[in-house]
Amino acid sequence: MKLVYTGKTKNVFEMENGNYLLKFKDDVTGKDGVFDPGMNEVGLTIEGVGDVNLRMTDYFFKKINAAGIRTHFVQANFDDTTMEVLPAKVFGKGLEVICRRRAVGSFLRRYGDYIEDGAELPYYVEMTFKDDAKGDPLVTREGLIVLGIMTGEQYDTIADMTRRITKIVADDMADKGMELYDIKFEYGYDANGEVMLIDEIASGNMRVYKDGEYIQPMELSELFFK
């Protein structure tokens, strides 16, 4: 296998069969030794975090595939903390797709003059460029089309997939007595332009509350698999 990309929390290898292998690491983003999923640099190492991230990703990707929603997931190997995935091209230089069920975080910082903290949102979808230097700026549907990053049809497909996937995750959290406030995803497309969910679904990609209190990502992982 050939190492093709070294990421903050995962390394990517090209396999002989044309697929790719994601190696989940115990490195997490943060600052000054404090875990913060919103940071853009590795801040510390937490033993076992790669394993729990892979297990949650495996759980949800299988559930999403079973619902008829396409992902790049092939199989996971918990012994070496890896996941085999189908090849996929990212949109532009990478996009993050956020689905919001309540007004918190950056949404509240932007629009706090118009909405109350924690107000319900109707599975509101927004997209941002993955650009650390520019603070991951928001981009509209029209902007993505004008820039040639995706078609209107692809945007609508992603928005629909995002709402469906978010409901799957939200329902699962609700069954465990927790509430999903928001979650972020990444998407790619195959040689035929067909959209698929890529990367991971792990505790660091979502904001979950219990009895009105925010649950830290590592605690969420423990509660989820309890």
Give short role names for the model-derived ranges.
Residues 109, 200-226:
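C-terminal helix-cap and adjacent tail motif
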Residues 19, 92-94, 177-180, 192-193:
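Coil-to-beta-strand transition motifs
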Residues 149-181:
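A long amphipathic alpha-helix within ATP-dependent nucleotide-binding catalytic cores
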Residues 99, 180-200:
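Conserved metal-phosphate-binding beta-hairpin within the catalytic cores
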Residues 72-81, 174-189:
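A short glycine-rich, hydrophobically flanked beta-strand micro-motif that places a catalytic Asp/Glu
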Residues 37-52, 134-161:
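Short histidine-centered catalytic/ligand-binding loop motif
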Residues 123-135, 166-179, 203-204:
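Phosphate-binding core of ATP-grasp and ATP-grasp-like enzymes
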Residues 1-129:
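Active-site loop/lid in soluble adenylation, ligation, and acyl-transfer enzymes
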